[in-house]
């Protein structure tokens, strides 16, 4: 018997747990609770219900009902008995392959009811016995799903490192495509927006990992990651004019601020960009389980990209004009630009006496000179290390 995936995705569950446990998202707690209880009730997620009732961050929101829990446990055990029977039948009537398939189906059921402890244990047993690469890959996907549900990103990263060589060795097209979604989300969570954008944008047109997250969230994460990492030309082709993006963003009211933010930056509507960036910060960054840790960095980097885009067209620009373009005060622009200049995040200088921003973009010769100096320093360090090694050898003789 094969276990059907539940209709509620893994990241929908983990996002609801995040919203329920965050003290800053009290306005979303009731909706999160409704989402969780709908999934728990419809799919008999007894392990998840037990976890929520025992977790200090969520227990206060749970009106614990032992009878409800016991009724779900009973249904789980009845279902597990069917899987055990299938394993026994395979052992008596079939070969090792059929036994492993039956074990994998039981592991999939543990994954679907969010039973991490028993699910991981059975996945490990199946992985060790499996000889086919495809079976090993599927088992690792199940373990990654369980780690995602409980937001254990350290384990997700470890499992992905274990999974990638197996995919390269014997993964078919469908499994390779699934990996893009699984890995793209992880890379975004560790602030590797460039890597995340490459994978998520690439898998949008062939996305099939609905067990992990809904399609519109893949598009949303792809747009967010791409907006901060792609150059202007790629933003146009891969986001602004993308058929997949155009099929999702305009159709979802919740994504209107994200769509407006990307378009206003591309169209050089900087005051509109600043307004919509504030909305994106509130509605897409601070309230997201993966992006909340990076929202300050993200907003700051997007402002820097906007400043760089405007200054690229000028050798000099008055601070008054720049402030008017962004719809903010002169003092704000002065302070914000100054925060980027010391680290060379913006190639400009501010003349406060005359109220002018001068760009100082390095030309190609300067760039080549800096590269030669850098390579020379590396070579000099290597020669010094080599000399020290030779001298130590001479002293020993």
Swiss-Prot record:
BP terms from Gene Ontology:
proteasome-mediated ubiquitin-dependent protein catabolic process
SMART domains noted in UniProt: PINT
| One annotated Gene Ontology cellular component of this protein | proteasome regulatory particle, lid subcomplex
Compartments reported by the entry: Cytoplasm; Nucleus
What keywords does the record list, in alphabetical order?
Answer: Cytoplasm, Nucleus, Proteasome
PROSITE patterns the record matches: PCI (PS50250)
What domain of life does the native source organism fall in?
A: Eukaryota
**Annotated signal peptide:** none
Chief location of this protein within or outside the cell: cytoplasm
Output the SUPFAM superfamilies linked to this UniProt entry. Answer: Winged helix' DNA-binding domain
Record-linked Gene3D superfamilies: 1.25.40.570
Q: Which residues form the PCI domain?
A: 192-364
Q: Which InterPro entries match?
A: PCI_dom (IPR000717), Rpn7/CSN1 (IPR019585), Rpn7_N (IPR045135), RPN7_PSMD6_C (IPR049549), WH_DNA-bd_sf (IPR036390)
- Protein function: Component of the 19S cap proteasome complex which acts as a regulatory subunit of the 26S proteasome, involved in the ATP-dependent degradation of ubiquitinated proteins.
- UniProt subunit comment: The 26S proteasome is composed of a core protease, known as the 20S proteasome, capped at one or both ends by the 19S regulatory complex (RC). The RC is composed of at least 18 different subunits in two subcomplexes, the base and the lid, which form the portions proximal and distal to the 20S proteolytic core, respectively. Component of the lid subcomplex of the 19S RC.
Question: Which protein, by its recorded name, is this?
Answer: 26S proteasome regulatory subunit rpn7
């Amino acid at each position: 018997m094969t276990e059907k995936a539940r209709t509620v995705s893994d990241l929908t569950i983990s996002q609801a747990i995040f919203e329920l446990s965050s003290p800053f998202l009290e306005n979303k707690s009731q909706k999160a609770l409704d989402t969780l209880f709908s999934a728990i009730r419809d799919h008999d997620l007894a392990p998840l219900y037990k976890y929520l009732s025992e977790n200090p961050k969520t227990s206060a929101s749970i009106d614990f009902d032992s009878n409800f829990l016991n009724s779900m446990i009973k249904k789980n055990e009845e279902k597990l008995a069917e899987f055990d029977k299938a394993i026994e039948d395979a052992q008596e009537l079939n070969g090792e392959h059929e036994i492993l398939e039956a074990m994998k189906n039981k592991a999939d059921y543990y994954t679907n009811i969010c039973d991490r402890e028993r699910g991981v244990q059975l996945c490990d047993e199946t992985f060790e016995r499996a000889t086919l690469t495809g079976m090993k890959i599927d088992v690792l996907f199940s373990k990654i799903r369980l780690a995602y549900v409980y937001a254990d990103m350290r384990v997700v990263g470890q499992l992905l490192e274990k999974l990638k060589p197996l995919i390269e060795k014997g993964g078919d097209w469908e499994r390779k495509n699934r990996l893009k979604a699984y890995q793209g989300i992880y890379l975004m969570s560790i602030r590797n927006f460039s890597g995340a954008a490459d994978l998520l944008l690439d898998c949008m047109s062939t996305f099939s990992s609905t067990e992990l997250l809904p399609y519109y969230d893949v598009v949303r994460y792809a747009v967010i990651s791409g907006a901060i990492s792609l150059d202007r030309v790629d933003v146009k082709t891969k986001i602004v004019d993308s058929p997949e993006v155009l099929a999702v963003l305009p159709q979802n009211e919740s994504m209107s601020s994200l769509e407006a933010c990307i378009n206003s930056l591309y169209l050089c509507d900087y005051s509109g960009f600043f307004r919509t960036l504030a909305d994106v910060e509130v509605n897409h960054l601070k309230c997201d389980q993966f992006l909340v840790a990076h929202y300050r960095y993200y907003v700051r980097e997007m402002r820097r990209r906007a400043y760089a885009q405007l200054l690229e067209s000028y050798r000099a620009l008055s601070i008054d004009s720049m402030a008017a373009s962004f719809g903010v005060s002169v003092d704000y622009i002065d302070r914000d630009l100054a925060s980027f200049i010391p680290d060379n995040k913006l190639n400009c200088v501010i003349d406060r006496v005359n109220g002018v921003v001068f760009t100082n973009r390095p030309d190609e010769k300067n760039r080549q000179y800096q590269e030669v100096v850098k390579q020379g320093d590396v070579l000099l360090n290597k020669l010094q290390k080599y000399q020290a090694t030779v001298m130590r050898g001479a002293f020993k003789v």
